[in-house]
Amino acid sequence: MTAADLPDDAVLVCIDMQVGFDDPAWGDRNNPEMEARVADLLAAWRAADRPVVHVRHDSAEPDSPLRSDGEGFAWKPEAEPVDGEPVFTKRVNSGFIGTDLEAWLRERDHSTLVVCGLTTDHCVSTTTRMAENLGFDVYLPADATATFDREGHDGERFSADEMHRTALAHLNREFATVVESADLSATR
């Protein structure tokens, strides 16, 4: 899979690239290079004049670092939208629920999405699953996503890397084609 294999109008969908995910309350995160890989994808998409959309989370939880009235709602500097790139704000894990994302994509006849951002096992996964269920062809660059350590119902701890790899395995070949960002960032 290379950038040349994608349709010219493949949409880069950047999920929750927000400063609030730098809050230590989230715990340990995997993939410290995720922001750089997202920046590479953004640069490639913009240079090729391909469509880019941004989805961000506005949490209703009073203590969330992702509330719209807090500093954590801001974009990470590596992934700030530029003029003309639509922004969709969601209140749940899916970028499609409560937003106009699906309508925007359908009005422009986009059928292929490349999904990146945070977090692999929550909002990236949910948006990817819904996109496929809605009939979109989805590519997921593994190194342009990341997640955090999690605790199971019984107190067992799972590392961020375990969660990341497991989430990608669940999505691969059923909801998305999992690739590496370098394949998609290559010059067309």
Curated annotation (Swiss-Prot):
Signal peptide: none annotated. Its EC number is 3.-.-.-. CDD domains: nicotinamidase_related (cd01014). Keywords: Hydrolase, Isopeptide bond, Ubl conjugation. It comes from the Archaea. GO terms for molecular function: hydrolase activity. The keyword Ubl conjugation applies. There is a cross-link at K90 (Glycyl lysine isopeptide (Lys-Gly) (interchain with G-Cter in SAMP2)). It holds the Pfam family Isochorismatase. The keyword Ubl conjugation applies. Belongs to the isochorismatase family. PANTHER family: ISOCHORISMATASE HYDROLASE (PTHR43540:SF1), PEROXYUREIDOACRYLATE/UREIDOACRYLATE AMIDOHYDROLASE-RELATED (PTHR43540). This is Uncharacterized isochorismatase family protein HVO_2328. It comes from Haloferax volcanii (strain ATCC 29605 / DSM 3757 / JCM 8879 / NBRC 14742 / NCIMB 2012 / VKM B-1768 / DS2) (Halobacterium volcanii).
